[in-house]
Amino acid sequence: MFWLGKDSKVFRFPLSFFHFPLLPDFKIAYDEIIFCAKLGSESGAYLAYVRNSISDDSCKKNSSERFFYYLCGIMEQVRAKKALGQHFLTDLNIAQKICNSLSGGSAENPDNVLEVGCGMGVLTQYLLRRDDIVTYGVDIDTESIAYLHAHYPDFTPRLREGDFLKMDLAEYFPNGVKVIGNFPYNISSQIFFKIIEHRNLIPESVGMIQKEVAERIAEKEGSKTYGILSVLLQAWYDIEYLFTVSEKVFNPPPKVKSAVIRLRRNNTEKLDCDEQLFVKVVKASFGQRRKMLRNSLRSAFGDFHGAEHPFFTKRAEQLSVADFVELTKWVSDNR
């Protein structure tokens, strides 16, 4: 059994009592559900135990637990999990503003959009109302997936339970996809590295992240916060810092302010250098950002046969994207 809350009353219902679809991958016939709800609770505390014909205890426990989370879909809210970096947006005006920040196609030729971390669908509901986009979703949280299945049944065929960072975007979206979301704080940087990796598939992204990360991404050379993500994203995308979001509009509230930024792929189809080497040069340069580039790059690529570049007396934060392109070409010729 799985308990949530106290002071509950127990009811027994046949499975046919519940008028919502089962998850598409359920293979088990459930005979009866013992359902326990805390009456009068705004959040709705639930207990669910699934009785079926499976004899293997471990299989029964796993299947029961999954169905329990599915039942949680009729709860008023999903529990935010610190381990997943979840801070659920509660302000509908902010959600609509984020939705409106993403460009679309047309009703006749809508763009594919992937929402990363759908949570309880606060942003999802506005995306689904647009006829110039087709919205897909991915979320690693079983409880959130259950909630979305129950509250947005028409969204179910386009909703995937899984890790965006491990998702094969080329397989699911061979013609490209725009990415949007209230990105989980603990993987926001990793999400942007994945966008860089799949830049040929992702023409645009709108994301809500920590304010300090957003500022760092939009920063120009010469600043102490200018770093790897700044250079790599600005090499292929135009960055717009759209607006700041108060910590008070989240549940639970984070300890820092958030911000929404927009990335739109620029006209640079290909850099005028080896792009894989460009990424390595940028990462190596900022790997020891307090040192001059001479030391940082020689640690990564060798002594360049004694050759020197004028940039060697500078630090990584002093170089623009164009400077890094030039430096990459030099490294390619001299290593």
Language-model segments: which ranges?
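Positively charged N-terminal leader segments that act as targeting/secretion signals
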Residues: K6-F13, L39-S41, S58-F67
